[in-house]
Amino acid sequence: MSRISNVNVPTNKRVMIGLTYIYGIGRSTAQKICQEVQVSVNKKVKDLSNQELVALRSIIESKYKVEGDLRREINLNIKKKKDIRCYEGLRHIRKLPVRGQNTHSNARTRKGKAIAIAGKKKPNK
């Protein structure tokens, strides 16, 4: 296992796929990073030289926000929206979908488990 940005990147995978194990790096970003370092995207992580690993680490640390820094920034943005009580912040507070999705029949994941409402009781005979 190679460590990049405090994440164990699997050695048996291709470099481009291995980089996607880092939070904040998707396939397109991984491809750009590989082009900058001039590493083939089809090369396996275990075949990378020490120099190439150092180059990957330095580019990721200098140009991209990943892992803890990115998570912290996202959480601070959500907290700021909650504090100023804008529409998106209110949706976060109420645990409802933020980006305009319908909630009449869907949004079970966001709203939580359905709560049963008791109907009219039948009289006993």
Curated annotation (Swiss-Prot):
GO terms for cellular component: cytosol; small ribosomal subunit. Part of the 30S ribosomal subunit. Forms a loose heterodimer with protein S19. Forms two bridges to the 50S subunit in the 70S ribosome. Located at the top of the head of the 30S subunit, it contacts several helices of the 16S rRNA. In the 70S ribosome it contacts the 23S rRNA (bridge B1a) and protein L5 of the 50S subunit (bridge B1b), connecting the 2 subunits; these bridges are implicated in subunit movement. Contacts the tRNAs in the A and P-sites. InterPro entries: Rbsml_uS13_C, Ribosomal_uS13, Ribosomal_uS13-like_H2TH, Ribosomal_uS13_bac-type, Ribosomal_uS13_CS. HAMAP family: Ribosomal_uS13. One of its GO terms (molecular function) is structural constituent of ribosome. PANTHER family: 30S RIBOSOMAL PROTEIN S13/40S RIBOSOMAL PROTEIN S18, SMALL RIBOSOMAL SUBUNIT PROTEIN US13M. Belongs to the universal ribosomal protein uS13 family. PROSITE patterns: RIBOSOMAL_S13_1, RIBOSOMAL_S13_2. NCBIfam families: uS13_bact (TIGR03631). This is Small ribosomal subunit protein uS13. SUPFAM superfamilies: S13-like H2TH domain. Transmembrane segments: none annotated. Signal peptide: none annotated.
